[in-house]
Swiss-Prot record:
This is High molecular weight antigen. Pfam families: Ribosomal_60s. It comes from the Eukaryota. Residues 14-26 have a biased composition (Low complexity). It comes from Babesia bovis. Residues 27-38 have a biased composition (Acidic residues). Residues 1-44 are annotated as: Disordered.
């Protein structure tokens, strides 16, 4: 859960959490995104 990371202390501001989610929101929620990345790689 991004809301309660066990490896990181709960001292991070909400901005940091949003930054992580914006960096890879679908990748974290939907592993299917990885398949799409592989598809894009093949197209490249």
């Amino acid at each position: 859960d991004w809301t309660t990371p066990s490896c990181l202390p709960p001292l991070l501001p909400p901005g940091a959490v949003e930054a992580v989610q914006e960096a890879a929101p679908e990748a974290a929620e939907e592993p299917e995104e990885e398949e799409d990345d592989m598809g894009f790689s093949l197209f490249d």
